[in-house]
């Protein structure tokens, strides 16, 4: 097994771990905000989806980097 494959696995795993933690924090804070001010549910939900989309970009970048590292 080459070091490129190990590096790719680490890159994908860490990016997925980071995204999972980030998504959990974003959603939990949104739920707290809606519980405090239910009238802002729509605005908070929109901001939450934008935040989740930005956080999910990291694993995609991690996979791209993993493919680049594997092909070297």
UniProtKB/Swiss-Prot annotation:
GO CC annotation terms, alphabetical: plasma membrane; proton-transporting ATP synthase complex; proton-transporting two-sector ATPase complex, proton-transporting domain
At the top level, the lineage of the source is Bacteria
TM segment ranges:
1-21, 49-69
Subcellular localization(s) per the UniProt record: Cell membrane
Q: What is its main location?
A: membrane
Topology relative to the membrane = Multi-pass membrane protein
The residues annotated as site (Reversibly protonated during proton transport) are: 56
Q: Which InterPro entries match?
A: ATP_synth_csu_bac/chlpt, ATP_synth_F0_csu, ATP_synth_F0_csu_DDCD_BS, ATP_synth_F0_csu_sf, ATPase_proteolipid_c-like_dom, F/V-ATP_Csub_sf
Q: GO molecular function of the protein, one example?
A: lipid binding
Pfam families xrefs: ATP-synt_C (PF00137)
Q: Which UniProt keywords apply?
A: ATP synthesis, Cell membrane, CF(0), Hydrogen ion transport, Ion transport, Lipid-binding, Membrane, Transmembrane, Transmembrane helix, Transport
| Database matches in Gene3D superfamilies | F1F0 ATP synthase subunit C
Similarity annotation: Belongs to the ATPase C chain family.
* Subunit record text: F-type ATPases have 2 components, F(1) - the catalytic core - and F(0) - the membrane proton channel. F(1) has five subunits: alpha(3), beta(3), gamma(1), delta(1), epsilon(1). F(0) has three main subunits: a(1), b(2) and c(10-14). The alpha and beta chains form an alternating ring which encloses part of the gamma chain. F(1) is attached to F(0) by a central stalk formed by the gamma and epsilon chains, while a peripheral stalk is formed by the delta and b chains.
Q: Which NCBIfam families does the entry mention?
A: ATP_synt_c (TIGR01260), PRK06876.1 (NF005363)
Q: By its UniProt entry, which HAMAP family does this protein fall under?
A: ATP_synth_c_bact
Q: What does this protein do?
A: F(1)F(0) ATP synthase produces ATP from ADP in the presence of a proton or sodium gradient. F-type ATPases consist of two structural domains, F(1) containing the extramembraneous catalytic core and F(0) containing the membrane proton channel, linked together by a central stalk and a peripheral stalk. During catalysis, ATP synthesis in the catalytic domain of F(1) is coupled via a rotary mechanism of the central stalk subunits to proton translocation.
Q: Return the protein name.
A: ATP synthase subunit c
- Protein's organism: Bacillus cytotoxicus (strain DSM 22905 / CIP 110041 / 391-98 / NVH 391-98)
């Amino acid at each position: 097994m080459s070091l490129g494959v190990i590096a790719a696995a680490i890159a994908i795993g860490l990016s997925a771990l980071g995204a999972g933690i980030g998504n959990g924090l974003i959603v939990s804070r949104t739920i707290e905000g809606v519980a405090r001010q239910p009238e802002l549910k729509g605005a908070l939900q929109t901001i939450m989806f934008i935040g989740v989309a930005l956080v999910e970009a990291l694993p995609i970048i991690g996979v791209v980097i993993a493919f680049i590292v594997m092909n070297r």
